[in-house]
């Protein structure tokens, strides 16, 4: 499919883990320039959050990512407040994550919905997304990917196997 893209477009192969990303790279051997292979987190950081976060939200201080327990929260607005006031991009607490919520995906979706330049950028840059291990996606990830398809017209190719789900608790 990478040969069918316009010269400005890319195809993204997205997976859950760095190991799976490396496996895909090894299998492809000769990766075309218009193919991006990354984890879901890395894709969201590089393509949506870092380039467009400050267009959507006013940040009082430079952004830093944190997975420390002391910064975890259970509410989207609390997470946004932490980003805007302290520059700390943290994650939901375990109880909230178990409900199928993923703060990074929710922020990325919010940016795409409310920041036209972000949605236009993604729509024109990526023709297709190949999502591996889709069975491990939580509800927030699913919502984000379905938005990319329905609202931005990005084609999705989803690969998953319920029997291999390692994150069934995610919802």
Regions found by a protein language model. Name each.
Residues 1-53:
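P-loop NTPase Walker
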Residues 35, 128-131, 156-157:
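Hydrophobic "anchor" residues on beta-strands that sit immediately upstream
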Residues 7-8, 123-125, 150-153:
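Short loop/turn elements that form and flank the Walker-type P-loop nucleotide-binding site
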Residues 54-133, 139-144, 168-171:
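Accessory N-terminal region flanking or inserted into the helicase ATPase core
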Residues 42, 135, 164:
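Short, glycine/acidic-enriched loop or turn micro-motifs at the edges of active sites
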Residues 14-16, 133, 159-160:
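Short His-Asn-centered micro-motif
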Residues 2-4, 26-27, 117-120, 146-147:
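Short, flexible, glycine/charge-rich loop motifs used to bind or transfer phosphoryl groups or to couple energy/partner
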Residues 1, 138-171:
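Conserved helicase motor core of SF1/SF2 NTP-dependent helicases
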């Amino acid at each position: 499919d990478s040969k069918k893209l316009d010269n400005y477009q890319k195809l993204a192969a997205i997976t859950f883990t760095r190991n799976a990303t490396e496996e895909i790279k090894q299998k492809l051997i000769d990766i075309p320039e218009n193919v991006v292979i990354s984890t879901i987190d890395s894709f969201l950081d590089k393509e949506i959050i870092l380039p467009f976060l400050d267009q959507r939200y006013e940040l009082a201080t430079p952004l830093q990512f944190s997975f420390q327990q002391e910064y975890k929260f259970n509410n989207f607005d609390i997470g946004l407040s932490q980003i805007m006031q302290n520059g700390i991009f943290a994650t939901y607490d375990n109880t909230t994550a178990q409900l199928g919520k993923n703060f990074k995906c929710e922020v990325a979706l919010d940016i795409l919905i409310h920041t036209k330049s972000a949605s236009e950028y993604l729509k024109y840059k990526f023709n297709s997304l190949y999502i591996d291990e889709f069975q491990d996606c939580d509800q927030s990830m699913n919502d984000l990917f379905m938005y990319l398809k329905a609202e931005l017209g990005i084609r999705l190719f989803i690969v998953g196997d319920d029997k291999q789900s390692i994150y069934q608790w995610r919802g």
